[in-house]
Structure formats: structure tokens, C-alpha cells
Amino acid sequence: MSTKKIMLKSSEGKTFEIEEETARQCQTIAHMIEAECTDNVILVLKMTSEILEMVIEYCNKHHVDAANPCSDDDLEKWDKEFMEKDKSTIFALTNAANFLNNKSLLHLAGQTVADMIKGNTPKQMREFFNIENDLTPEEEAAIRRENKWAFE
């Protein structure tokens, strides 16, 4: 049985073919298909070819049907290996999952980031997320006093 295919086009103009049913894991794409906003080519201008290709790889692996059986343990192992990427790629995948409204990929990426910062000090977290500290030493001390339990 032949399945309907659609094309996704990245910000650089590279196109990727994917089964429509698989692409529907991304609610943004599903809504575009249902609203007939596409002529079988969907522009995904907010992401590079590299990131779009990773999203498609994830969707293909997570598409469940009789032809693609995968145990939960195998999928969990695959997910862990899939997320073994540098920080900027993980952030880009998180943004892509959010934009495309792919809840399972967003959860996986978010959990990966959470695991990366687990146990970090506030200073380490600011460095990790490239956030400037705009608190005075007095404000920091007040926060530490008010939330003493969190710093023990």
C-alpha cells in the first residue's frame, strides 16, 4: 500500500520527503495539512537542513506501525543516543520541537537539558545558558536567605 508523501523545505531551501502520517507527529505540520496550506511542500523556514533532517529522523523512528515495530527499551536507548549532541544542537532541536509542536521530541530535548544542568550552581547555570548576572551581591544574599533550603 502506497502512503502519501509530503516535502519539507528548510531555511536553506533543501527539501526532504517524508510520509504525511509520520510528519503529522508535528502538530504544526498536521494543522497546515488539514488547513490545506500546502501544495505538498511545506516551508520550514525557522530551521536549518541539519536540524530538519534530525527532526525527520526522530519522527521516522517514533512513527509506530506494523512495519516499524520497536520495543520501549530499544526506543529509549535510541533516544539517548540520538540526544548525544553538542549543546547548541540540543538547543536548536528544542526550538524546532517547540515550533513544530512535537510534544515527545520537546519532552526529550527538555529532559536532556535538565539532565545537563542538574546539580549546577546558579553561576554554572548562567554560564551554561549564557545569562548575564544582573543581581547585586546584596540581592543575591537576600535570595539565598529567603530560599536557604534550596542551597543546602
From Swiss-Prot:
Restricted to siliques. GO terms for biological process: auxin-activated signaling pathway; jasmonic acid mediated signaling pathway; protein ubiquitination; response to auxin; response to jasmonic acid; ubiquitin-dependent protein catabolic process. The keyword Nucleus applies. It holds the Pfam family Skp1_POZ. The keyword Nucleus applies. Pathway: Protein modification; protein ubiquitination. CDD domains: BTB_POZ_SKP1 (cd18322). Its main location: nucleus. Belongs to the SKP1 family. This is SKP1-like protein 8. The lineage of its organism: Eukaryota, Viridiplantae, Streptophyta, Embryophyta, Tracheophyta.
